[in-house]
């Protein structure tokens, strides 16, 4: 599969003690090939529960190409949790803490009773996903499914234990000796 092939060959950047993998799906660089995006979207559709979903939800930034592609395939509109406040009526702010940053995310466009599928590029610490789930619950949405393309670290387990929601992923990885390893 192209996703796994490109992960195995992607560059690794060390910041402090953490090794970041740089990949088109997680970073948008060096280039996002349509065939990779198509493969990822098709695989998400195969494992996801989109039946009756009224909205797809992601956080900016790298979930945006994923939900755009999925929206075109499924005809389900999408909502992006943004990093800046718009002060629209009903906007829900939520604190987000990840392995590399802390800040607010803002949810707009979700109505009570919406049936949503959450899509994200990577789950590693779980901080972004916990923030998304919290905001959606506060908005009164029903979470139908949660799908992340790449799983790294303990974030999936942390989110599942903390929220009770199961998270589906396409591939689980680690970085060992300066290379991505598929687990």
UniProtKB/Swiss-Prot annotation:
<dbReference type="GO" id="GO:0005737">
    <property type="term" value="C:cytoplasm"/>
</dbReference>
<dbReference type="GO" id="GO:0004422">
    <property type="term" value="F:hypoxanthine phosphoribosyltransferase activity"/>
</dbReference>
<dbReference type="GO" id="GO:0052657">
    <property type="term" value="F:guanine phosphoribosyltransferase activity"/>
</dbReference>
<dbReference type="InterPro" id="IPR029057">
    <property type="entry name" value="PRTase-like"/>
</dbReference>
<protein>
    <recommendedName>
        <fullName>Hypoxanthine/guanine phosphoribosyltransferase</fullName>
        <ecNumber>2.4.2.8</ecNumber>
    </recommendedName>
</protein>
<dbReference type="InterPro" id="IPR000836">
    <property type="entry name" value="PRibTrfase_dom"/>
</dbReference>
<dbReference type="InterPro" id="IPR026597">
    <property type="entry name" value="HGPRTase-like"/>
</dbReference>
<dbReference type="GO" id="GO:0032264">
    <property type="term" value="P:IMP salvage"/>
</dbReference>
<comment type="similarity">
    <text>Belongs to the purine/pyrimidine phosphoribosyltransferase family. Archaeal HPRT subfamily.</text>
</comment>
<dbReference type="Pfam" id="PF00156">
    <property type="entry name" value="Pribosyltran"/>
</dbReference>
<dbReference type="InterPro" id="IPR050118">
    <property type="entry name" value="Pur/Pyrimidine_PRTase"/>
</dbReference>
<comment type="subunit">
    <text>Homodimer.</text>
</comment>
<dbReference type="GO" id="GO:0006166">
    <property type="term" value="P:purine ribonucleoside salvage"/>
</dbReference>
<keyword id="KW-0808">Transferase</keyword>
<comment type="function">
    <text>Catalyzes a salvage reaction resulting in the formation of IMP that is energically less costly than de novo synthesis.</text>
</comment>
<keyword id="KW-0660">Purine salvage</keyword>
<comment type="pathway">
    <text>Purine metabolism; IMP biosynthesis via salvage pathway; IMP from hypoxanthine: step 1/1.</text>
</comment>
<keyword id="KW-0328">Glycosyltransferase</keyword>
<keyword id="KW-0963">Cytoplasm</keyword>
């Amino acid at each position: 599969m192209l996703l796994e092939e490109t992960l195995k060959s992607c560059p690794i950047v060390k910041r402090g003690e953490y090794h970041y993998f740089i990949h088109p799906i997680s970073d948008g660089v060096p280039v996002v090939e349509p065939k990779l995006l198509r493969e990822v979207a098709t695989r998400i559709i195969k494992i996801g529960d989109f039946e009756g979903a009224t909205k797809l939800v992601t956080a900016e930034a790298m979930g945006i190409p994923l939900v755009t592609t999925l929206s075109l395939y499924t005809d389900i509109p999408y909502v992006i949790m943004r990093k800046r406040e718009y002060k629209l009526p009903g906007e829900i702010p939520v604190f987000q803490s990840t392995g590399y940053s802390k800040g607010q995310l803002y949810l707009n466009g979700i109505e009570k009773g919406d049936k949503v599928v959450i899509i994200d590029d990577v789950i590693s610490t779980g901080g972004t996903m916990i923030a998304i789930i919290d905001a959606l619950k506060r908005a009164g949405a029903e979470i139908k499914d949660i799908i992340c393309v790449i799983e790294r670290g303990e974030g999936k387990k942390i989110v599942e234990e903390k929220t009770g929601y199961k998270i589906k992923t396409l591939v689980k990885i680690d970085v060992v000796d300066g290379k991505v390893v598929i687990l």
